């Protein structure tokens, strides 16, 4: 519990070192709470999207196809003018991701310092994730609006997401490495 509270107290402390036993309880708590928060934030955003799609199907049946069955209900909208507003969904997603990055930035930096690495090693996943969250709405809007869409942007986004996952796995490996037992340029060994 002390490791978790210490992580929250040191949100803006990018100096020094943190052992694995201090970092992981805090990081997993932040990720867990963030997923719960994102889930709770997504409920109203997704509900609004479903309500908009159902309203289009009811008022403009020529612009939508409804398929329903036991445990299944879907609405496919054929006219771009009637597409639900995805803005709130992406806003909640962006706020949630920003919160995770802010809450973990200093702790990741201190953990990397403990392994003898600069905090900059934590940036590649953030960069690739930012590209995805910025480009995804535009790419999806283009794919849904075009007859025979240009898939090159989608493939670039797919490559970006692959690089994000690879860089995230690499960062997790770095964060899992053992501590340097001697003092390094970031300070004495963490207690």
Q: What role is predicted for each listed range?
A:
Residues 30, 34-38, 122, 134:
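Hydrophobic alpha-helical transmembrane segments in multi-pass membrane proteins
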Residues 26-29, 123-125, 162:
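Hydrophobic core positions of alpha-helical segments in small-molecule transporters
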Residues 120-130:
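Central hydrophobic cores of alpha-helical transmembrane segments
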Residues 1-33, 106-119, 173-191:
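Membrane-interface extramembranous regions at the lipid-water interface
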């Amino acid at each position: 519990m002390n490791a978790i509270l210490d992580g929250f107290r040191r949100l803006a402390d990018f100096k020094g070192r943190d052992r694995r036993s201090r970092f992981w309880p805090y990081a997993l708590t932040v990720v867990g709470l963030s997923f719960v928060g994102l889930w709770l934030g997504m409920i109203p955003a997704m509900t609004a999207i479903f309500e908009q799609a159902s309203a289009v199907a009811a008022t403009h049946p020529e612009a939508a196809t409804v398929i329903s069955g036991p445990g299944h209900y879907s609405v496919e909208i054929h006219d771009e003018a009637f597409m639900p507003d995805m803005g709130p969904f992406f806003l909640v997603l962006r706020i949630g991701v920003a919160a995770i990055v802010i809450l973990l930035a200093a702790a990741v930096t201190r953990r990397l310092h403990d392994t003898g690495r600069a905090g900059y090693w934590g940036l590649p996943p953030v960069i690739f994730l930012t590209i995805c969250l910025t480009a995804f709405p535009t790419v999806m809007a283009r794919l849904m609006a075009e007859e025979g869409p240009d898939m090159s942007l989608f493939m670039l986004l797919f490559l970006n997401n692959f690089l994000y996952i690879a860089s995230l796995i690499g960062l997790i490996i770095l964060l899992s490495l053992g501590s340097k037992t001697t003092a390094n340029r970031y300070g004495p060994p963490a207690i």
